[in-house]
A protein has these predicted regions:
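Structured catalytic-domain cores with a bias toward divalent-metal coordination
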Residues: 1-172
Length: 172
């Protein structure tokens, strides 16, 4: 960031972070579409939605822990296309009309930058495009897809849960 502001929301789901689990009341990342008011995370999700739609916000990075190690090709049980760790996740390649709408390009640059400083070659990042609108119904409930639907570009950055905490923090 060369100018402007960086807003950070720390510990959005503290209980989940401390337990290294998806969420005490369900995975909060998948509560951004169709959430009932009776859900215990409803108020928190509404606050995040309000932040996302703030006119000053031009790009969202959703920092996450992911399972295993994402790889475009299957290499092993822990390193394959069905895993999420060590990836830049996008719902689509482009968001037309947005200042930072070149999601594929931004994610590739981010992965390249991270990969220049990996602690071990097996920690390399890759871009994972979920093609959410056309093929991933579960991801249509995600924070990043909510952001896209409001005209805000969003990228998920996933560090592998297989890594110790200090390394996950290093990568994110």
């Amino acid at each position: 960031i060369k100018n402007g502001n960086l807003w950070i929301i720390p510990d959005l789901n503290r209980a989940s972070i401390l337990r290294r689990a998806h969420g005490w009341y369900g995975d909060m990342n998948y509560k951004f579409n169709g959430l009932k008011k009776s859900d215990r995370d409803y108020q928190t999700v509404q606050k995040v939605k309000k932040l996302i739609t703030n006119p000053q916000i031009e790009l969202i990075f959703n920092l996450h822990d992911g399972s295993g190690f994402y790889s475009p090709q299957r290499e092993s049980y822990q390193r394959n296309p069905n895993r999420w760790g060590q990836s830049c996740v996008i719902d689509q390649a482009e968001l037309d009309g947005a200042r930072f709408g070149h999601l594929q390009l931004l994610s590739e640059k981010a992965a390249d930058q991270i990969n220049q400083h990996v602690l071990h070659q097996e920690h390399r990042f890759h871009v994972k495009n979920t093609h959410t609108a056309s093929s991933d119904k579960v991801m249509q409930k995600a924070l990043t897809y909510y952001a896209l639907r409001t005209g805000k570009p969003a990228i998920g950055l996933e560090a592998s849960k297989k890594l110790p905490t200090h390394q996950r923090v290093y990568y994110l």
